[in-house]
Curated annotation (Swiss-Prot):
<comment type="subunit">
    <text>Heterotetramer of two alpha and two beta subunits.</text>
</comment>
<keyword id="KW-0479">Metal-binding</keyword>
<feature type="domain" description="ATP-grasp">
    <location>
        <begin position="9"/>
        <end position="244"/>
    </location>
</feature>
<dbReference type="GO" id="GO:0006099">
    <property type="term" value="P:tricarboxylic acid cycle"/>
</dbReference>
<keyword id="KW-0816">Tricarboxylic acid cycle</keyword>
<dbReference type="GO" id="GO:0005524">
    <property type="term" value="F:ATP binding"/>
</dbReference>
<dbReference type="GO" id="GO:0004776">
    <property type="term" value="F:succinate-CoA ligase (GDP-forming) activity"/>
</dbReference>
<feature type="binding site">
    <location>
        <position position="99"/>
    </location>
    <ligand>
        <name>ATP</name>
    </ligand>
</feature>
<comment type="similarity">
    <text>Belongs to the succinate/malate CoA ligase beta subunit family.</text>
</comment>
<feature type="binding site">
    <location>
        <position position="102"/>
    </location>
    <ligand>
        <name>ATP</name>
    </ligand>
</feature>
<dbReference type="GO" id="GO:0006104">
    <property type="term" value="P:succinyl-CoA metabolic process"/>
</dbReference>
<keyword id="KW-0460">Magnesium</keyword>
<dbReference type="InterPro" id="IPR016102">
    <property type="entry name" value="Succinyl-CoA_synth-like"/>
</dbReference>
<dbReference type="InterPro" id="IPR017866">
    <property type="entry name" value="Succ-CoA_synthase_bsu_CS"/>
</dbReference>
<dbReference type="GO" id="GO:0004775">
    <property type="term" value="F:succinate-CoA ligase (ADP-forming) activity"/>
</dbReference>
<dbReference type="InterPro" id="IPR013650">
    <property type="entry name" value="ATP-grasp_succ-CoA_synth-type"/>
</dbReference>
<dbReference type="Pfam" id="PF00549">
    <property type="entry name" value="Ligase_CoA"/>
</dbReference>
């Protein structure tokens, strides 16, 4: 789950991280009111969407008068903001953050992530803040420094000080940087975050260290422990299909391709998408119906996939372990009839009650294309999507 910058800064404040004064605004008049409350002479008007690259897309403006705050708020609020993370369609800006201006001397980068290789939390830092960190990692990997944090001890003073020095924090400002890094770590740990990022971490001309941006992602499996985080959820920023899928306990993620995928098990789902791509196709979604799929869930899965206007074919790939193939077959038949399926459907199933499931599909009268292996299924669905 993602949250907005202003919400991330609320979390950082709770853990003692220095951030500029600012508030969200949902209208132009509210933006002006917030600016007047903050006082000048400089304000930053920021679009609030769940994507990076807002500045390059025109979603962050520096205002030097109340009139400019009004002008920029009017420009940004309601705009379709396109960044490298939104795709060409962009995201509509429904809220702003109005923040006091900052004296920027150094822009640094720090973040915390879970490293699956070391199975530890990793603190990363770079002197190249304010930029796309993926670009820095690709072109100048030597500028990214890492510290492995032991969960049993947390981020030690020496570790924080060492990283701060390596990324260019002046010696006199290292105690401030240490407090921010340790506060960021505590926020990451105590909220079950999967990402906590400050980009940029600013060092001002007088040596003051502040977090000018805040980005958090949270582990959805841990949200039951954090109702205060769930309260931050903004459904306007989420894919409507993914919201609908969550109501039926379906793991669904929209993609850019034209081949729908309905699979049981996340690992098999990813392998299925890889195989489709291997044969020249493009998956339209990730969809895991899980081990307890019912006819209703399969029907809803078909409805979700068919909401994609670019869908050209569907591949159902089932391994019947916990989930029986005859139950899936029943769901496929009911789902196909319920939605008046009008795109080619390829089905491959193996495992428990496989023969019964295949017979049910064959006797259904539906134009289902059967396959015995994942490779055959992928080849057939790619051909079907291409109209061959």
């Amino acid at each position: 789950m993602k949250i907005h910058e202003y919400q991330g800064k609320e979390i950082l404040r709770k853990f003692g991280v220095a951030v500029p004064r600012g508030k969200p605004a949902f209208s132009v008049d509210e933006a002006v009111k917030v600016a007047e409350e903050l006082g000048g002479p400089v304000w930053v008007v920021k679009a609030q969407i769940h994507a990076g690259g807002r500045g390059k897309g025109g979603g962050v403006k520096v205002a030097k008068s109340i009139e400019q705050v009004r002008e920029y708020a009017n420009q940004i609020l309601g705009m379709q903001l396109v960044t490298h993370q939104t795709g060409p369609e962009g995201q509509k800006v429904n809220r702003l953050m109005i923040e006091e201006g900052a004296d920027i001397k150094q822009e640094l980068y720090v973040s915390l992530v879970v490293d699956r290789v070391s199975q530890k939390i990793v603190l990363m830092g770079s002197s190249e803040g304010g930029m796309d960190i993926e670009e820095v990692a690709e072109k100048h990997p030597e500028l990214i420094h890492k510290v492995i944090v032991e969960p049993s001890t947390g981020l030690l003073d020496a570790q924080a000080d060492d990283l701060a020095a390596k990324i260019g924090v002046p010696a006199a400002s290292i105690p401030q940087a240490r407090a921010i890094l340790q506060g960021l770590y505590k926020a990451f740990w105590e909220t079950d975050a999967s990402l906590a990022e400050i980009n940029p971490l600013n060092v001002s001309g007088d040596g003051k260290v502040t977090a000018l941006d805040a980005k958090f992602n949270f582990d959805s499996n841990a949200l039951f422990r954090h109702p205060e985080i769930v309260a931050y959820r903004d459904l306007d920023e989420e894919d409507p299909a993914e919201i609908e899928a969550s109501k039926f306990d379906l793991a669904y993620i929209s993609l850019d391709g034209n081949i729908g995928c309905l699979v049981n098990g996340a690992g098999l789902a990813m392998a299925t998408m890889d195989t489709i791509k291997l044969f020249g196709g493009e998956p339209a979604n990730f969809l895991d119906v899980g081990g307890g799929a019912t006819t209703e869930k399969v029907t809803e899965a078909f409805k979700l996939m068919l909401k994609n206007p670019g869908l050209k074919a569907i591949l159902v790939n089932i391994f019947g372990g916990i989930m029986r193939c005859d139950v899936i077959a029943e769901g496929v038949i009911a789902g196909s009839k319920a939605v008046n399926l009008n795109v080619p459907l390829v089905v491959r199933m193996k495992g428990t009650n496989e023969d019964l499931g295949k017979k049910m599909l064959a006797d259904s009268g539906l134009p289902i294309i059967s396959a015995d292996s994942m490779e055959e299924a992928a080849q057939k669905v790619v051909a079907a999507a291409a109209g061959k």
